[in-house]
Amino acid sequence: MMEKIRLILLSSRPISWINTAYPFGLAYLLNAGEIDWLFWLGIVFFLIPYNIAMYGINDVFDYESDMRNPRKGGVEGAVLPKSSHSTLLWASAISTIPFLVILFIFGTWMSSLWLTLSVLAVIAYSAPKLRFKERPFIDALTSSTHFTSPALIGATITGTSPSAAMWIALGSFFLWGMASQILGAVQDVNADREANLSSIATVIGARGAIRLSVVLYLLAAVLVTTLPNPAWIIGIAILTYVFNAARFWNITDASCEQANRSWKVFLWLNYFVGAVITILLIAIHQI
């Protein structure tokens, strides 16, 4: 049993849990202005069960291509034996359904709408016949929805409406999400082509994809600077993503695997930028 739990948690990418739990918690706190049981329920859901489902479904239906991908098998993606696939799918359902029921019951019609979109995006990204991850450009939009939707749910679940400033921040976050998905796809161009998989990066090439990623990161930084002072500090923090991706501005399809270096930096940049945002918000609150 402990081995099964270990494999399930490995598949859920613990290093990336913060990317979904933090947006929910931050949006909830900014809009509701308080921490209650619903806040903690959402945090727990988007921290672990949500990621078990999102990455678990992906690992099951991407098994054949992941076997050919040298970067899979660690923090960047588990390659679980086929004997574990049914367990992983059951875990995805069992761990999420109770949380979903409560979030639907105690949420608002608007948060329920975003929650429905979030669940559909998680399933559609990897599930057979839908496979949004193999539909160029839709793949980036869907992946970004995975990370933006928790924030939208957090911002609307208590009955308050997001302010204009929050919508701008969410727009910046959505651009960040698209840029990040494209950055991740660059390193897999050759592996995906060998497995006959399509992605935005296989269609426009590694160089085109990395440059699009840089542009989207830059737009995200510019958009957030339109918010009231001192949002420009967050804009500067986002520029670290721009510089990280821009290092590979002239990458080619033949050398696409080199982009893995930027992806490894990206995983840790999330913690740095998250810390900057947190410290900034604490400082503003104290002022």
UniProtKB/Swiss-Prot annotation:
Membrane topology reported for the UniProt record: Multi-pass membrane protein
Q: Offer one Pfam family short name for this entry.
A: UbiA
Give TM regions.
15-35, 37-57, 87-107, 137-157, 166-186, 218-238, 265-285
Sorted UniProt keywords: Cell membrane, Membrane, Transferase, Transmembrane, Transmembrane helix
Cell compartment(s), UniProt = Cell membrane
Q: Which GO terms describe its cellular component?
A: plasma membrane
Identify the pathway.
Answer: Carotenoid biosynthesis
Q: Which family does it belong to?
A: Belongs to the UbiA prenyltransferase family.
Protein name per its UniProtKB record: Lycopene elongase/hydratase
Tell me the organism. Corynebacterium glutamicum (strain ATCC 13032 / DSM 20300 / JCM 1318 / BCRC 11384 / CCUG 27702 / LMG 3730 / NBRC 12168 / NCIMB 10025 / NRRL B-2784 / 534)
